[in-house]
């Protein structure tokens, strides 16, 4: 399942999360990433030692991330979605 940018924006909790997510929509921000028809996953290097492990279930539109954010979905999940929407070949 492929989500459009507009669909991703509607999932975001606020405009700041959209902006932060778009800032993470670069392959260089992700040390590992993968995709299937049903899910996206990746490791996003934050400011800490260990990258955040992010998963997006495309079938049920569900999110999981190891970051400490209280926003749902977090900027990492949104970033992974924006990256996939702009570059599904990655």
Task: Describe these PLM feature segments.
Residues 1-90:
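Long, low-complexity, compositionally biased intrinsically disordered regions
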